[in-house]
Amino acid sequence: MPSIISISDLSKTYGSGFKALKDVNLEIEKGEIFALLGPNGAGKTTLISIVCGIANLSAGRVTVGGHDIITEATAARTLIGLVPQELHTDAFETVWGTVSFSRGLFNKPKNPAHIEKVLRDLSLWDKKDSKIVTLSGGMKRRVMIAKALSHEPQILFLDEPTAGVDVELRKGMWEVVRDLKASGVTIILTTHYIGEAEEMADRVGVINKGEIILVEDKANLMQKLGKKELKLHLQAKIETIPDSLTAYNLELSDDGRAVTYNYDTKGDRTGITSLLSDLRNAGIRFSDLDTTQSSLEDIFVSLVRAP
């Protein structure tokens, strides 16, 4: 699948000497949903701002749809719709007016049918004549998405799109994102709701301290770095784990009534069969068991905490 965004050796250094981005290399594939994850201050918004032409790069090269963002800035920017983290809207303009105006900024001809479709898809149609100042935070966020889609971009950046949005509106918003993907739009999102990234993304990138530390297909990532946890609920309380079970690195619950065993999802052998046998030999019986698997959030936390 061809790359629609190509980022090569990208760096950003501020006047103070702070390096916000350090030799970032990244390829975004056409038509995918790409989740860019990282802690606060990791460089997510800086990276997005450079690709969208809002901030200047210090070194490196970025192309969007084959257009260099510096030498062919207009052509590159026209392909992009951006929903920024901060809410910037004309408070006293109507929803219809501000979305239509955004389309005009890209020299697109008027297209009331397209504006209507966008507003309906985002459940904003009944608010089309309302002034933005009267809307809730979640509805204002939807207006920002409508503005970003007004000129029919091929790429949509969503920087924390569900911040301040209630659960019901959030679900509806992700339905719109799925429909956009189905229509061929490439979507790059950042979110603190990592469960959403786990559900929505095709690929995941993790950025920390200005460096891309991982880019992986989501399914492969979950398989390669995910762990499974087996929890055994004991019939009788134990004070300590017997020495004969040390090799399993079991965790004993505070009340002494459960042990937890972590095993690798990609391993040829899980070790569970031998564990159960050794537990029996140690005179430990269990009444119930359950298993859980690492979430994307668990993997993310382990990656950014790594030295």
Put a short name on every predicted segment.
Residues L156-D159:
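Catalytic Walker B motif of ABC-type/P-loop ATPase nucleotide-binding domains
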Residues E229-L303, P307:
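Short, charged/small-residue-rich alpha-helical element at the C-terminal edge
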Residues E152:
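Conserved catalytic motifs of ABC-family nucleotide-binding domains
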Residues G60-T71, A75-A76:
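Conserved ABC transporter NBD signature motif
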Residues W174-D264:
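ABC transporter nucleotide-binding domain
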Residues S100, G104-K127:
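Conserved ABC ATPase "signature" region
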